[in-house]
Amino acid sequence: GLLEVMDGGTATGVDKKAGGKLIVSTNALEVSGTNSKGQFSIKDGVSKNYELDDGSGLIVMEDTQAIDTILDEHATMQSLGKDTGTKVQANAVYDLGRSDQNGSITYSSKAISENMVINNGRANVWAGTMVNVSVRGNDGILEVMKPQINYAPAMLVGKVVVSEGASFRTHGAVDTSKADVSLENSAWTIIADITTTNQNTRLNLANLAMSDANVIMMDEPVTRSSVTASAENFITLTTNTLSG
């Protein structure tokens, strides 16, 4: 079964069983109960120590927050607000700065994530700011999307640590000017934003450290049939320091 508790809703004493699906918004007045991971509670716009199990979803709305959230296998989280200490486990999916509720998509440049750990899970950054993130494991992915129309580019700040075969991908001119990127046995793929005119995808980086790692620059992996034959699309990466 499916239980959705959205803006202004209340649900207490929830007992989520295997196979059930629970979708919760931090704009709910109060949600509490148990799942396969133990007790959880969301109240007054704050989710704290919530471990989402299989089939669970959390939507962090603007001006609300989630603290120390764990996304287990196949759980999802969409954040338009602030989250701190989120852990994204295998097969879980996290989205920053974007929410899709029943086909209605909302973006937010105010979204912020701090001190995230991605362990074989996936995090998509659509808008907002990600501060200090580590991603590891062969199935671990951190993907930063190209700037959305009418929204500032997504920003990476502080340490970005990619290791143990994980993948780091950026599309177009995202803001990495305040990021210290460390690649260990991993790869960073920088994907140009293809247009019909000449365009230089420029990335400025505070520092880049590499150990048994690769930085790959490429066009969007799509057909160029709509791109003018004479168009030149290229990538420029500038870093204050390069080591490794």
Please give the residue ranges for each predicted region.
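The right-handed parallel beta-helix/beta-solenoid scaffold, focusing on the short coil/turn
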Residues: G1-L3, G9-T12, A18-K21, N27-L29, ...
